[in-house]
């Protein structure tokens, strides 16, 4: 009986677990939103940065490449740093990368900002699921993981639409400032 009750408790007792995981959900949403949002701004960005499509593709490839490198390392990072420090670093990296890209005066600067965004996104994604497993009881994890997956899948679905609205009233720079 005691074993069953232990299985129904979260490993870390948090009074409001949904409130605790909300910043990570927002960070993951924005990370995925940023993945698809630049597609709509392609013509404006290519013209403003004076680059061709093959060079411009690096804004997507660089972002995804960095995420692909950081994701497997995130487990190692949790052994070296506290979860709080990793969350703060991940969110800060994404914000700093967004600002660098938004203020970018040339293609290299925008690309560097995108890659820094990738660092933040690569840290936040796995942390969101790890923290959920710690602060929610096991019997709630199915629901929690479903909601987290919904957040991640919803962002790229609405990314192009929101970007179109942003571009209708602003410039490509505003896309990056929206992430902040």
Q: Which sequence ranges carry the predicted segments?
A:
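Membrane-interfacial loop-to-transmembrane-helix junctions in polytopic alpha-helical membrane proteins
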Residues: 12, 16, 52, 109-112, ...
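Recurrent gating helices in multi-pass secondary carriers
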Residues: 20, 28-39, 67, 156
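Membrane-interface helix caps of multi-pass secondary transporters
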Residues: 29, 34-52, 73, 77, ...
């Amino acid at each position: 009986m005691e074993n069953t009750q232990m299985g129904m408790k979260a490993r870390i007792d948090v009074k409001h677990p949904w409130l605790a995981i909300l910043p990570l959900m927002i960070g993951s949403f924005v990370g995925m939103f940023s993945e698809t949002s630049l597609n709509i701004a392609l013509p404006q960005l290519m013209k403003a940065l004076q680059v061709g499509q093959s060079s411009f593709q690096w804004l997507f490839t660089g972002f995804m490449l960095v995420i692909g490198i950081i994701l497997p390392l995130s487990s190692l990072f949790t052994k070296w740093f506290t979860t709080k420090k990793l969350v703060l670093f991940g969110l800060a990296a994404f914000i700093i990368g967004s600002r660098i890209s938004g203020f970018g005066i040339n293609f290299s600067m925008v690309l560097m900002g995108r890659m820094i965004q990738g660092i933040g996104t690569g840290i936040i994604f796995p942390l969101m699921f790890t923290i959920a497993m710690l602060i929610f009881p096991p019997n709630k994890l199915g629901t929690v993981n479903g909601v987290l997956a919904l957040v991640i899948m919803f962002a790229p679905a609405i990314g192009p639409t929101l970007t179109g609205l942003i571009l209708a009233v602003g410039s490509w720079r505003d896309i990056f400032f929206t992430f902040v």
